[in-house]
């Protein structure tokens, strides 16, 4: 902090005030003095990318939805309900848990924003259900979620780390959900969109994916900032932890995906898609991916869906996608009406 901001060292953020036994004075967040430029950069990108599922014409997918067999309809509905559970956990536990351990006041606000963003993702699946499904189908899917042991096992796995006394382990867990665990489910709408099915629904998934890329990148970045300050021995301990927790989660994910996609022939490539993104997660944390090209091989038509229609790629600084554009209002001048 510069000398012009002496107040900073004499005060606490509201969370810091509580952690200090409610002693001292609280400061307001100052967006005119940025401790870490990445906080403002990510905040700006997230707010520029803001979207709502109600703006996506999911009803245009009704024709192709009705062309699916009952088995495929159930698979889609269950897959999306499983994703809803993961986003429910991330919204109400994962991102909230990062706020008290933030390095800056602005990081607290970024994670508060992330929590809302993930809430929008969870809501978006509800929009899809209310458009495509009957009430009985929705009820069946939510019943399936609470009764599927393999789904529950992978969903519960990260919870103890979110609430851990170790902020770095919590940070890794917060990065694993948007960085790895969701992608086996994301694979299905991209597979269908490549075959002309549910294109507007897949647009929603692309928008979610765009947000997840930012989410995972930022958590990995904050993890690296903290780890690099530690002694080498401690750094190696955390590296070992990251790989151990990831490999355990991969096994849980494989078990779940093989059951989910049983009879549809999609499990192997969905697993490859998950491993591809597991490698990206590791890179965001500062580690090399151990996965071979063969392990992460995805069919070209599915891979192309990552950028189709939304006109996006995994460089989140490239801007909004074409599938969802927010309007910009500009006051007109007299000269504008001289044709």
UniProtKB/Swiss-Prot annotation:
* Cell division in keyword set: no
Question: What InterPro entries does its record include?
Answer: Ferritin-like_SF (IPR009078), RNR-like (IPR012348), RNR_NrdF-like (IPR026494), RNR_small (IPR033909), RNR_small_fam (IPR000358)
- Which residues are the active-site ones? 125
The answer to whether keyword Iron applies is: yes
Give GO terms: molecular function aspect only. Answer: metal ion binding; ribonucleoside-diphosphate reductase activity, thioredoxin disulfide as acceptor
Record key words, sorted? Deoxyribonucleotide synthesis, Iron, Metal-binding, Oxidoreductase
- Coiled-coil region(s): none
Q: Which residues does the annotation say bind Fe cation 2?
A: 215
EC number(s) stated in the UniProt entry for this protein: 1.17.4.1
One biological process term from GO is:
deoxyribonucleotide biosynthetic process
- Top-rank lineage group of the source organism: Bacteria
Residues noted as binding Fe cation 1 in the record, renumbered to the chain: 87, 121
Q: How is the co-factor bound, per the entry?
A: Binds 2 iron ions per subunit.
Top enzyme class, one word, equals oxidoreductase
* GO cellular component annotations of the record: ribonucleoside-diphosphate reductase complex
Q: Which reaction does it catalyse?
A: a 2'-deoxyribonucleoside 5'-diphosphate + [thioredoxin]-disulfide + H2O = a ribonucleoside 5'-diphosphate + [thioredoxin]-dithiol
Query: What's the stated role of this polypeptide?
Result: Provides the precursors necessary for DNA synthesis. Catalyzes the biosynthesis of deoxyribonucleotides from the corresponding ribonucleotides.
Family, similarity comment: Belongs to the ribonucleoside diphosphate reductase small chain family.
From the Swiss-Prot or TrEMBL record, give the protein name.
Ribonucleoside-diphosphate reductase subunit beta
The record's gene field reads: nrdF
